[in-house]
C-alpha cells in the first residue's frame, strides 16, 4: 500500500483491493486515473507549502476547470460536466489524497456552492 509520506508516484492500482472493487465502469475508472494523475503531479508537490501558507493556490481553479472538475454535477446546458455524485466523490477522493486542504476547498466550491445553485437556483442564475 502507498505510504502517504512517500515520494513514489500514485497509481490507481496502488489501492486496488479486490474486496473494494465496486466496478463503477470505465468512465469512472478513466476519471479516477485522470484526476489522480493531475492531483499527484500538480497538487501533491505544493500541498505542504499550501498548508504552511494557509492559502489556496488560485492557479489550480482554471486547471481543474479544464479537466471538467468544476460543476461536475451541473447539466451541460449550464456549462457543467453532467456527471453524478459518484463521479464527484471520485474526484474528491483523488484531490484529497494529494492534499486534504485543497480537497476541502474544492468540495466546498463544487458541492456547497455550485451544486446548490444547480439544485435551487433560478434559470437565470444557472445560466450565469
Regions found by a protein language model. Name each.
Residues 1-27:
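Intrinsic disorder at enzyme termini
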Residues 30, 37, 42-128:
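Glycine-rich flavin
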Amino acid at each position: 500500500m502507498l505510504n502517504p509520506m512517500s515520494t513514489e508516484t500514485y497509481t490507481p492500482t496502488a489501492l486496488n483491493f479486490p474486496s473494494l472493487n465496486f466496478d463503477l465502469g470505465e468512465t469512472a475508472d478513466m476519471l479516477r486515473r485522470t484526476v489522480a494523475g493531475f492531483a499527484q503531479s500538480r497538487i501533491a508537490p505544493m500541498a505542504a507549502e499550501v498548508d504552511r501558507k494557509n492559502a489556496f493556490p488560485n492557479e489550480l481553479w482554471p486547471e481543474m476547470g479544464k479537466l471538467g472538475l468544476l460543476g461536475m454535477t451541473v447539466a451541460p446546458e449550464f456549462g457543467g460536466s453532467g456527471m453524478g455524485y459518484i463521479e464527484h466523490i471520485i474526484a474528491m477522493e483523488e484531490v484529497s489524497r494529494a492534499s486534504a486542504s485543497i480537497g476541502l476547498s474544492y468540495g466546498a466550491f463544487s458541492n456547497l456552492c455550485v451544486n446548490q445553485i444547480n439544485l435551487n437556483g433560478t434559470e437565470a442564475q444557472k445560466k450565469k
